[in-house]
Structure formats: C-alpha cells, structure tokens
Amino acid sequence: MHPTDTRDPQYYHRVVDCQWACPAHTNVPEYIRLIADGKYTESYMLNRESNVFPGILGRTCDRPCEPACRRTRIEDEPVAICRLKRVAADLRGDIDHLLPKAAAEKNGKRVALIGAGPASLTVANDLVPLGYHCTIFEALPKPGGLMRTNIPSFRLPVEVLEEEMDMILDMGVEVHYNHRIDSMK
C-alpha cells in the first residue's frame, strides 16, 4: 500500500474525505498507517505538521473527519480517527530531537501576540524557528487560554496540556503573564 498523494487538494477532496473535512487537513490515512505499523512517534510528528497539539486534540476535537469517513459507506461506524490521534500521542517515544528549534540566527523582527492560547502558541511555533522574536502577553497567570480554563481536567489532563505547550514555549518564547492588554493604542 502506498501513501496517499495529497499534493493536489482537488484529488484528496475527491478521494480522502476525512482529510478534506479536517480543518487542518491532517494527513489522516498516513498517520493511521503509521499507527498500524506501530510507529507512534512518526504518527505523532506527522500530526504535528498540520496541528501543533495532537495530544490535546486527540482528547477534545469535535471530529469533523469522522462523519466524512468513507468507512461508513460499508459499515455502521467510521474509523475512530480522533481516538487514534490520542493513541499516537499517548504511546509516542521521546520527540525532543524532532521538535522545531529556535533559529540560530535571529532575523531582527519582533512579533507581539495577545493571549497565550492555541492561536498565539501556534504562531510562535511557526515563527521562532524562522528567527522571529515572539513575545506573548497573557492576562492569566498561566498559558493555555480557553484550553486551560474551559476544558475540564477529566477530558484534558493538565499534564498533557502543559507538555504540548512547553514544546513551544521552551523554544525561547517570551511570555508576560498577568499582563492584560486593554487597548491597541
């Protein structure tokens, strides 16, 4: 079996319905293949290419991919795509050497981000390796935004939340906690 070629979005829209339904267009068929082969770390890292919080989303995503799953054409239930994402996150090995690193040379550009929620953390994850200095201003004493304040810990354990956020913050993101921004002036 060969990996699905997803370079042409029109192709995978017609053929890989689950991937098209995913807002992040995560390569669902490939990460499931990797899990089937027992390659949990590789599956996690593939997920992380399109979504920097696979362990969090494996517990909290509303799973738009599953109603689109082609398996329902022949069986009653779709593939448990979201649960498989969680399996990869929970069973992965050490990934420190695979995570993005801060650029050795800074480009001299600074980016201010308001709120230490998933959007700002994702921006920092993408820009710090490109040499940007990212500073986050967070009104609360801890990062996470609504992930921390509105998702109960029985659904999203604090350890999972903090581990995935730390993967980004540990790249050298500057964070000012208890610093509410009331105006852009």
Enumerate the language-model features and the residues they cover.
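Ferredoxin-type iron-sulfur electron-transfer modules and their immediate structural context
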Residues: 1-110
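Beta1-alpha1 glycine-rich phosphate/pyrophosphate-binding loop at the start
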Residues: 25-36, 42-48, 77-82, 114-182
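Glycine-rich dinucleotide-binding loop and its adjacent helix/turn
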Residues: 87-105, 163-184
